[in-house]
Amino acid sequence: MQEERLTHLRQLEAESIYIIREVAAEFGNPVMLYSIGKDSSVMLHLARKAFFPGTLPFPLLHVDTGWKFREMYEFRDRTAKEYDFNLLVYKNPEGEALGINPFIHGSAKHTDIMKTEGLKQALDKYGFDAAFGGARRDEEKSRAKERIYSFRDKFHRWDPKNQRPELWHNYNGQINKGESIRVFPLSNWTELDIWQYIYLENIDIVPLYLAAKRPVIERDGMLMMVDDDRIDLKEGEKVEERMVRFRTLGCWPLTGAVESQAQTLPEIIEEMLVSTTSERQGRVIDRDQSGSMELKKRQGYF
């Protein structure tokens, strides 16, 4: 009998589905973190495949900062309604009461209070012992050395020196009470893999990933899209229409657009084939200080 050979994408798909099923079987109260971006959309698609024709055996959790793009909120609510997902939305109540925002308080404080602390609060509130995330190793250097099962202590902290071996796809999910595991089923995928899979599987994505004329300003070497009237224009800044798209999505004041003509998935894939820069070049939170992503993860970030 001739052995069937899986394509590169089907191998990645099979690995991710295996990981998702393993977590669902091994942990008592898992959750899938849903940030509404392309990686979350792929991860959610894989989870649906993993348990088809049944429903997802865990909820989705969106840690909301209040500063996502309007199109992201619309996409989130439409997706949850269309597939009848159990979507939990959590916002740090203390941060909301203090009016924490990226313009006044800066990216570091905004991210720490509204994202890191918000996530930790949500995980504690619902008692989740495992949380799926859409991070990939090719995105950023601290993520490159993180395991698929990322152990977190009772304070949700990550210690890069205290990681468990993962030989031959064997994952150690043994934890004590109060500890948890962050699980990254897309660890071995690249940005190009993600886009090719989205095209292959016809996965719905937020339209912001496709190039269109959008209102932007130039600030600190970044093209910031003006998404609502909370924009804090500085002297000399002028809003202008440019043909841009986003390679990564987050809070709109902290996420830079790139000039592009790629209006279709094949055009995005073609653009990725010649790209020499990281998709996270437009994320302001990665510029806070040297090693800022690893520091954030040590403190409990995604």
Swiss-Prot record:
It is an enzyme of class 2 (transferase). Pathway: Sulfur metabolism; hydrogen sulfide biosynthesis; sulfite from sulfate: step 1/3. The keyword Metal-binding does not apply. InterPro entries: PAPS_reduct_dom, Rossmann-like_a/b/a_fold, SO4_adenylTrfase_ssu, Sulfate_adenylyltrnsfr_sub2. HAMAP family: Sulf_adenylyltr_sub2 (MF_00064). With CysN forms the ATP sulfurylase (ATPS) that catalyzes the adenylation of sulfate producing adenosine 5'-phosphosulfate (APS) and diphosphate, the first enzymatic step in sulfur assimilation pathway. APS synthesis involves the formation of a high-energy phosphoric-sulfuric acid anhydride bond driven by GTP hydrolysis by CysN coupled to ATP hydrolysis by CysD. Belongs to the PAPS reductase family. CysD subfamily. This is Sulfate adenylyltransferase subunit 2. It comes from Zymomonas mobilis subsp. mobilis (strain ATCC 31821 / ZM4 / CP4).
